[in-house]
Amino acid sequence: MADSDDEYDRKRRDKFRGERDSYRPERRDERRPMGGAANSRDEWSERNPFRGSSAAGGGGGGGGARHRPDYSDYRGSGPRARYGSPGREMPPAKRMRPDWGDSEMRSNPRFGYDPYLVQAWNDHYQSLHSAYSHAGHGPSVRETGPAGGGGVSGDTQTQPAMLTLKQFLDTQDENISDSEVMRKYTEYKTDFKRQQLNEFFVAHKDEEWFKNKYHPEDSVRRSEEQRGFLKRRTEVFLELLENGTIGSVKVDSSQADALVRVLDTCVIKLEGGTDEDLKILDEKPKDPPIVYERKSETTESAVVAKREPESPKTEKDDDLPGASSPQHKSLRPVNLDEENWDEDEPMEVHPQTGKDGEKSDDRRSKEPEDEESVKSDNEKKLKKKKIKKRKRNSSDDDSSSSSSSDSDTESDDEKVKAKYDVEEGLRADQKAEALKDKEEAATAAKEKLLAPESPQPEDVVDPKEALEIKSEASEESKQDKTEQPVGQTERPTTDNPAEKNGEEEGAKAEDKPEAGTQESTANEVTETIDLDKVKDGPHPRALHRTSSIFLRNLAPSITKAEIEAICKRFSGYLRVAIADPLVERRWYRRGWITFTRDVNIKEICWSLNNQRLRDCEMGAIVNRDLSRRVRPANGITAHKQIVRADIKLCAKIAMNLDDRFKLWCDSNRSDAEDAEKKAGQEATNGSGASSSPSYGFNSKNPVLQNITDYLIEEASAEEEELLGLAGDNKDGDGEPIERDESLISVLDRLVLYLRIVHSVDYYNHCEYPYEDEMPNRCGIIHARGPAPMRVTSNDVQEYIKAYDGKLQQFLTKTVQLSDEEIKELGAKNPETEVEKFVQANTQELAKDKWLCPLSGKKFKGPEFIRKHIFNKHEEKVEEVRKEVQYFNNYLRDPKRPQLPEHPGSSKRTESESGRGSGYRPPMYPPFSAMPYGFAPPMMGGGGRGGRNFPPVRREMPLEHQRRIIGYHDLDAPINSDMFD
């Protein structure tokens, strides 16, 4: 037992031994020195390679100090990690474990701890920002890390630390005055800010996302594209407003299905769908196709073999091999020719005919008594025939078969031939009856379709009547089919080609004319085929359903055109959307690729995962469908006072966004007038004519017409004053929720306008960016949830105030910076930059000998080079002017992207600023840990005070506890603040 316990302790101490051995090419025991003891592997010094022999306490030759083996020993000679950079050796991603003290690494659960090793990909990109950590500004973020005083994780880029005033004074002369110091320090801060903006622009000016924002050509093109999307959405909204779709739905969570239908209708219209495609919303989702498994077929056939003794024909069928062994069943219903003999479906075999006429008549009489036995007989007969055909084919192909097998095949052929000879007469009679029934059905259909005033029946076909007639004809044909014998369904293909069709074309095949019929009958049946064309015409398309792939990591240098070039090779590709980069992810982006619903999205995702774009793995995964498209908001929003405040907010947001994108400007007056004529009645909601003057909200938007009528608040103030009713009495228990349906209908129209046109979810106080390129063009909406029973006026006022603050981002207008403001930030002059460009391309080789590097030509003077550049290299000069405008557009944006400030640039405490970066960190316990040597508090015990802990329990009152004794000089003046 002692040996077993020792072995157990060894395994418990070294739980990663097997994982390390898997990375080694040779066994670990062979690498151990031979001079050690037998149990030297159990020594603590080997388990902990950072301890020396003195720490181990002796105990074997293997107990000396060892170095930690390199990861190459563990990893072997396999390929490098998937997410690794080519120029950097890294351990496998699965072996990266966070330290317990690194709380900063988990500060951001979304992008914290570099889950996809973006930092490893971005080593080449980091060199662009190497100038950020220049001398005099402290170490870079990656060098300092979380413990270097930066206070941020190594995955976040920041600006270099700006010198404090004290550090700046150390660089100046001692005799400098205070005013001169402040002036120079202000200039230093201005130059520092200009330098950071310029370096950020140079680092990102070649990236597509940056060009779409500020480039003079690309930004205009992108703005026009977005404006086109908004115009199309506006047209769709006005169309839905005109036909009453918008007015028939309320933005309540109880009407989730109606809201989803409105959103899907918008998507279908945006995708170019027609009213015919909208019928797909009324159809129920189809069941998934049945997948036939061969294992179940074997068991079913085995069950049939077990039921053989119950069949009345077992005595004759026992000599055939098909009754005892399970045979192959069909997977789809087709005719029983010899080429697809294994695709027959036993479900179409009807228990009407046997091997001869008498047995068939007897079976008809016994059918009500024993139906299961008849089915089993038919299935066995079908299997027998398959085996006979198989034997017949094999006997024709194989010349070396034995005489016994030949005789069996001949006997089988004789039985089959006799069977068909017996059934021939009965088949002809039933065929005539079936043709007669089909003639009657076609005549009835023709009488219903032909109108008295129309000479052509195709022009007056009503789809509903056609469907009803078709269903009646199909029922009659099914009845005729049940009367047909088994032999008729098993005829060769030369008898009737119409019987080749599958189950989905069964009704069409039944209406086709038979061979040898009269011409009048053929014409009538042809008209029935026209009914099929009416029914099976263009089916509605499910344009609102898509499949999509999510790209987790896209390098900043990857363009949208490159992704489109890869995705266009796959069928069903629709569009691609790329999100704006985030500084937390080192400017890496995310993307969504949209395909049609009928593609194999997993196969496409697998193909994308096997491809690398610009040496970057995109990390493609399948994007799931939206789980809940209608999500509830606070039910207090249905209160009348809150609804009126929401109408005011929605109207302001709509006007601000319309003005930002110039949706209802004078240039589109004709379109706006047409829209007003279409939606004028429903926009006013019966409150008056649309031509009446509106005050406060002057907009051509039909949704905002006469909106001020609903913004005037009414109250019975005089009545309450006379009756002595005070509003404070309601604050105790609150007042019930008061709903005003007229106000709610106006608010719903505004909320849906913001959601459909501007992609603003009002009740979620957020905007869904680039929604027209996303897989779901109208995906999620928040609606009013269940209302509470009562609400106080204090809650109402707080809710209105809080909601107003959350929506300020849509209420504030974006104002570009003026020329004076951007001049302070380092704006450039186009003519000055052009002059610098000319001077840079004018080189003096010798006296009266000048060179133009752009063309390599030599000139006698610089004025000739200047004229040459403006004449022959005009496109280069134009590029310089565009570059200047590009940079100035970046400076004009008040919300321009830039690196966050270094934490050291903010105002620090005196203790932090006095300690240099070269000192070791203080020996304080971690923030979230107890001090060293203290045990955690027990349950029910005391504890320490603080924000996250309960107050300390005191056994005695505060005044009875021991007071702190202080000492002071007796000659000192009396200080009442001193403690005694």
UniProtKB/Swiss-Prot annotation:
<feature type="compositionally biased region" description="Acidic residues">
    <location>
        <begin position="336"/>
        <end position="346"/>
    </location>
</feature>
<feature type="compositionally biased region" description="Gly residues">
    <location>
        <begin position="55"/>
        <end position="64"/>
    </location>
</feature>
<comment type="function">
    <text>Acts as a mediator between the cap-binding complex (CBC) and RNA-mediated gene silencing (RNAi). Involved in innate immunity via the short interfering RNAs (siRNAs) processing machinery by restricting the viral RNA production. Also involved microRNA (miRNA)-mediated silencing by contributing to the stability and delivery of primary miRNA transcripts to the primary miRNA processing complex containing drosha and pasha.</text>
</comment>
<feature type="modified residue" description="Phosphoserine">
    <location>
        <position position="85"/>
    </location>
</feature>
<dbReference type="GO" id="GO:0016604">
    <property type="term" value="C:nuclear body"/>
</dbReference>
<feature type="compositionally biased region" description="Polar residues">
    <location>
        <begin position="682"/>
        <end position="697"/>
    </location>
</feature>
<comment type="subunit">
    <text>Interacts with cbp20, Dcr-2 and pasha.</text>
</comment>
<dbReference type="InterPro" id="IPR007042">
    <property type="entry name" value="SERRATE/Ars2_C"/>
</dbReference>
<feature type="compositionally biased region" description="Basic residues">
    <location>
        <begin position="381"/>
        <end position="392"/>
    </location>
</feature>
<feature type="modified residue" description="Phosphotyrosine">
    <location>
        <position position="83"/>
    </location>
</feature>
<feature type="compositionally biased region" description="Basic and acidic residues">
    <location>
        <begin position="461"/>
        <end position="483"/>
    </location>
</feature>
<keyword id="KW-0943">RNA-mediated gene silencing</keyword>
<dbReference type="InterPro" id="IPR039727">
    <property type="entry name" value="SE/Ars2"/>
</dbReference>
<dbReference type="Pfam" id="PF12066">
    <property type="entry name" value="SERRATE_Ars2_N"/>
</dbReference>
<dbReference type="GO" id="GO:0031053">
    <property type="term" value="P:primary miRNA processing"/>
</dbReference>
<feature type="region of interest" description="Disordered">
    <location>
        <begin position="675"/>
        <end position="697"/>
    </location>
</feature>
<feature type="compositionally biased region" description="Basic and acidic residues">
    <location>
        <begin position="353"/>
        <end position="380"/>
    </location>
</feature>
<feature type="compositionally biased region" description="Basic and acidic residues">
    <location>
        <begin position="40"/>
        <end position="49"/>
    </location>
</feature>
<feature type="modified residue" description="Phosphoserine">
    <location>
        <position position="311"/>
    </location>
</feature>
<comment type="similarity">
    <text>Belongs to the ARS2 family.</text>
</comment>
<feature type="compositionally biased region" description="Basic and acidic residues">
    <location>
        <begin position="497"/>
        <end position="514"/>
    </location>
</feature>
<keyword id="KW-0597">Phosphoprotein</keyword>
<dbReference type="InterPro" id="IPR035979">
    <property type="entry name" value="RBD_domain_sf"/>
</dbReference>
<dbReference type="Pfam" id="PF04959">
    <property type="entry name" value="ARS2"/>
</dbReference>
<dbReference type="GO" id="GO:0005654">
    <property type="term" value="C:nucleoplasm"/>
</dbReference>
<feature type="compositionally biased region" description="Polar residues">
    <location>
        <begin position="517"/>
        <end position="526"/>
    </location>
</feature>
<dbReference type="GO" id="GO:0045071">
    <property type="term" value="P:negative regulation of viral genome replication"/>
</dbReference>
<dbReference type="GO" id="GO:0050829">
    <property type="term" value="P:defense response to Gram-negative bacterium"/>
</dbReference>
<feature type="compositionally biased region" description="Basic and acidic residues">
    <location>
        <begin position="414"/>
        <end position="450"/>
    </location>
</feature>
<dbReference type="GO" id="GO:0003676">
    <property type="term" value="F:nucleic acid binding"/>
</dbReference>
<dbReference type="GO" id="GO:0030422">
    <property type="term" value="P:siRNA processing"/>
</dbReference>
<feature type="region of interest" description="Disordered">
    <location>
        <begin position="290"/>
        <end position="540"/>
    </location>
</feature>
<feature type="compositionally biased region" description="Polar residues">
    <location>
        <begin position="485"/>
        <end position="495"/>
    </location>
</feature>
<feature type="compositionally biased region" description="Basic and acidic residues">
    <location>
        <begin position="530"/>
        <end position="539"/>
    </location>
</feature>
<feature type="compositionally biased region" description="Basic and acidic residues">
    <location>
        <begin position="8"/>
        <end position="33"/>
    </location>
</feature>
<feature type="region of interest" description="Disordered">
    <location>
        <begin position="889"/>
        <end position="922"/>
    </location>
</feature>
<feature type="region of interest" description="Disordered">
    <location>
        <begin position="1"/>
        <end position="104"/>
    </location>
</feature>
<protein>
    <recommendedName>
        <fullName>Serrate RNA effector molecule homolog</fullName>
    </recommendedName>
</protein>
<feature type="compositionally biased region" description="Basic and acidic residues">
    <location>
        <begin position="305"/>
        <end position="316"/>
    </location>
</feature>
<keyword id="KW-0539">Nucleus</keyword>
<dbReference type="GO" id="GO:0035194">
    <property type="term" value="P:regulatory ncRNA-mediated post-transcriptional gene silencing"/>
</dbReference>
<feature type="region of interest" description="Disordered">
    <location>
        <begin position="133"/>
        <end position="155"/>
    </location>
</feature>
